[in-house]
A protein has these predicted regions:
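N-terminal juxtamembrane cytosolic/stromal segments of multi-pass membrane proteins
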Residues: 1-42, 222-234
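Juxtamembrane loop-helix boundary motifs flanking transmembrane segments in multi-pass membrane proteins
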Residues: 3, 7-14, 18-22, 27, ...
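Amphipathic, well-ordered alpha-helical segments in soluble domains
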Residues: 18-21, 51, 86-87, 154-157
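Hydrophobic alpha-helical transmembrane segments and adjacent short intramembrane/lumenal linkers
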Residues: 71-75, 88-204
């Protein structure tokens, strides 16, 4: 029992180390210091925070949807990272990076962890509007805005982190690696949007609970439709 409590405390200690001293944390990743401990701690903490937020947005429909979203939201972020990691790693290696895939994985997890912390910090706001604003489209758009804000912040951290980690690599190919990173960030966003659409529903609509919906339409048309309904165009 004491050992489990110690492990839980250790996980959050690692996360707080990232939040309080991001530069020092990234320097340790660049040097390959305690990578397994960092990876496990960030995975555990971010999964827990995403699960809490997922449960809140899913509770707009039913307890089953809350449970489903609590599971699917952490899976969404982790699967997006895993799908895009090989592209960033191998292209970077091809153009002079000397870092291991574990270092890239740890650096990407810092971004995911930052996103999870921001969403967790905004969870009371989402819960407040869930209770007081009984409008499905408004709640969806509010959370899309939260996802966009936290995602942009996380991607900014990621861009800075990967640039920092690669600063001592082959300088001749630095400009090329920067272009690859920018391209990869666009790819990461596109994969994330499509995967999120594939794993839906996270919120749930009126009717019976379903784990997954049929593949139809796309994320962007759905957002436009939600805006139109909120403004009374439909």
């Amino acid at each position: 029992m004491i050992k489990r409590e110690f492990q839980s405390t250790h996980y959050f200690t690692v996360l707080m180390g990232l939040l309080r001293d991001r530069q020092g944390f990234m320097e340790e990743i660049r040097q390959g210091v305690r990578l397994p401990s960092k990876i496990i701690s960030l995975l555990v903490c971010s999964s827990l925070f995403f699960a809490v937020y997922g449960a809140i947005i899913g509770s707009s429909h039913s307890p089953l949807q809350a449970l489903s979203s609590a599971f699917k939201l952490p899976c969404f972020y982790l699967m997006t990272l895993i799908l895009c990691l090989p592209t960033l790693y191998f292209f970077s290696i091809l153009f002079g990076s000397s870092k291991s895939i574990g270092q890239y994985f740890a650096m990407l997890l810092t971004s995911v962890a930052v996103i999870s912390v921001l969403e967790f910090s905004l969870a009371p706001v989402a819960l407040f509007f869930l209770i007081t604003a009984h409008n499905y489209q408004f709640f969806v758009l509010l959370n899309v805005g939260i996802f966009a804000l936290t995602g942009f912040t996380g991607v900014t951290f990621l861009y800075q982190g990967v640039q920092f980690m690669s600063a001592q690599d082959n300088e001749a190919a630095e400009e090329t690696r920067t272009r690859i990173l920018k391209f990869w960030l666009i790819l990461y966003a596109l994969v994330g949007c499509q995967l999120g659409w594939t794993l839906r529903p996270f919120f749930g609509t009126s009717g019976e609970f379903v784990l997954f919906r049929a593949m139809e339409g796309n994320f962007y048309l759905s957002i436009l439709k939600a805006i139109g309904e909120l403004l009374g165009f439909n």
